[in-house]
């Protein structure tokens, strides 16, 4: 989404060039796109590809005893919400932006090297939502040691002040019956 009435087109150009540069780093072509008018700038990409069926790693193939490895600290959703509400300081904002800009390529390469059984991303359903999905599909259970989970700086303070995405509240409502 882009609001050309409030933002100069040079901002849109910078956003698009940034996406193209990251796609080049990832070794993928950019083949098209679309833009919608929206008050709030939004940018995203969809990647389509093919994979050897013998090398697919899914989210429903975990095995009891597997370790859970997070490749980035949690908290971008909360910090993004704080940014939208003008309640994030400069350092915390840039830490979240830098995390979101970082490719997962090295994590993917490490995953292949060690031969993981399953993987998933942590997006809108949060750690608990995605872990519940993985456990249900794999017919396993999981234990999380809270103090071992990496979080971005400032996330707890923001959450304590009620700055959380709307989806977080829905995720909690969904998960509280399934998590002890």
Residue ranges with predicted function:
Residues 1-88, 151:
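Glycine-rich anion-binding loops of enzyme active sites
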Residues 2, 83-95, 160, 174-179:
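Active-site phosphate/oxyanion-binding loops
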Residues 6-29, 36-41, 113-114, 119-180:
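Glycine-/charge-enriched secondary-structure boundary and capping motifs
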Residues 25, 63, 106-114:
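Secondary-structure boundary elements
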Residues 34, 60, 71, 96, ...:
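Glycine- and other small-residue-rich loops at beta-strand/loop junctions that grip anionic moieties
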Residues 41-43, 47-48, 73-74, 100-104, ...:
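Long, contiguous hydrophobic alpha-helical segments, chiefly transmembrane helices and signal peptides
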Residues 46-56, 91-111:
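Active-site glycine-rich loop that binds ribose-phosphate moieties when present
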Residues 80-85, 104-109, 129-131:
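Short amphipathic alpha-helical segments, especially helix-boundary/capping motifs
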